[in-house]
From Swiss-Prot:
Subcellular locations according to the entry: Cytoplasm
Superkingdom per UniProt: Bacteria
Role according to the record: Methylates ribosomal protein L11.
Keyword Transferase: yes
GO CC term (a single one): cytoplasm
Cysteines paired by S-S bonds: none
Pfam families attached to this UniProt entry: PrmA
Family: Belongs to the methyltransferase superfamily. PrmA family.
Signal sequence, start to end: none
UniProt organism field: Streptococcus pneumoniae serotype 4 (strain ATCC BAA-334 / TIGR4)
A single GO BP: methylation
Record-given protein name: Ribosomal protein L11 methyltransferase
Keyword Transferase attached: yes
Length: 316
């Protein structure tokens, strides 16, 4: 029987996406996230309240490797890669441990984290292996969480989806920067966007996004490509959405202002509370006005508008 190895990394919440992506680059066949924030204040679609869970600053990223991979080498490589980033991000006191799993344990451990989740009023994310019947008006996003890059249930993704519901009315051109799983592009298509252009610097993410898009019918209007933020992009957009780290977000703001049409929107998520002022000041200096600010725990999402009419805009 084939066996698998489970590598657990405990890290500050801000480092979730970074650590997950590094583990995938180092050969993980899947990544699961355990985050106490996912249980705070949540109610499932049947009205059952989740048990109270103490909110922690740290999350656990669990990566799965076949037994043909030497996880001690993976651990050493991961430590070295993360050590290079200590000036860029406070990851906290890293804790790394490994466990051997049988094939059936791998399957059970993997899938137990993921169930259909109603994320917004209209959008429900469903694991690709699940049979799910949508209710009237419910839009389904099929994802394969085994490909990592998020399951769509992280607070930053949830708020990005809420923001897309808020600004999309149909017929828009959308740029999805740092697409990861492709969930925001798929949602944009379901919400009526005419054309979506998705970019990611990571070739693995480009492949993952394309595979997730193919799980959902009618997504021919989504175009995925490798790209470094918005460098070299010449496509004018009604909406630009980026759910990435705040220190990276500020580097796309000038290009976003260049590409967003008048009265268009820039949605920025993935902003830890300590970085909020930095992001807001950068966006406002470029000429954007803050229209909506969402908060969940320590995470922030901002919807900025490119407009000359600032009446009704927050701070306008």
């Amino acid at each position: 029987m084939e066996t698998w190895q489970e590598l657990k990394v405990t890290v500050k919440r801000e480092g979730e996406e970074l650590v997950s992506n590094l583990l995938i680059e180092l050969g993980a066949q899947g990544v699961a996230i355990e985050d106490s924030m996912d249980y705070v204040g949540n109610v499932d679609r049947f009205g059952e309240i989740f048990p109270e869970v103490e909110q922690q600053e740290e999350i656990v990223v669990t990566a799965y490797y076949p037994d043909t991979v030497d996880v001690t080498v993976v651990e050493a490589d991961l430590q070295a890669r993360l050590a290079e980033l200590t000036d860029f991000m406070d990851l906290g006191e890293l804790k790394i441990g490994t466990t051997a799993l049988a094939e059936e344990d791998w399957a059970d451990n993997w899938k137990k984290y993921y169930e259909p989740a109603r994320i917004t009023h209209d959008l429900t994310i469903v694991p690709s292996w699940t049979d799910y019947e949508a209710t009237a008006g419910e839009m389904i996003i099929k994802l394969d969480p085994g490909m990592a890059f998020g399951t769509g249930t992280h607070p930053t993704t949830k708020m990005s989806l809420f923001a897309l519901e808020q600004v999309l009315r149909g017929g828009e051109t959308v740029l999805d920067v740092g697409t990861g799983s492709g969930v925001l592009s798929i949602a944009s298509s379901l919400l009526g966007a005419k054309e979506i252009f998705a970019y990611d610097l990571d070739d693995v993410a480009v492949r993952v996004a394309q595979e997730n898009i193919e799980l959902n019918p009618g997504m021919e209007n989504i175009h995925v490509a490798a790209g470094d933020l918005l460098k070299g992009v010449e496509i004018e957009a009604d909406v630009i959405v980026a759910n990435i780290l705040a220190d990276i977000l500020i580097h796309l703001i000038d290009d976003a202002y260049r590409l967003v049409k008048d009265e268009g929107y820039l949605i920025m998520s993935g902003i830890i509370k300590d970085k909020l002022d930095m992001v807001r000041q950068s966006a406002e200096s470029a000429g954007f006005f803050l229209e909506t600010h969402m908060v969940q725990g320590e995470w922030n999402t901002c919807v900025f508008k490119k407009t000359k009419d600032i009446s009704g805009v927050i701070g306008g």
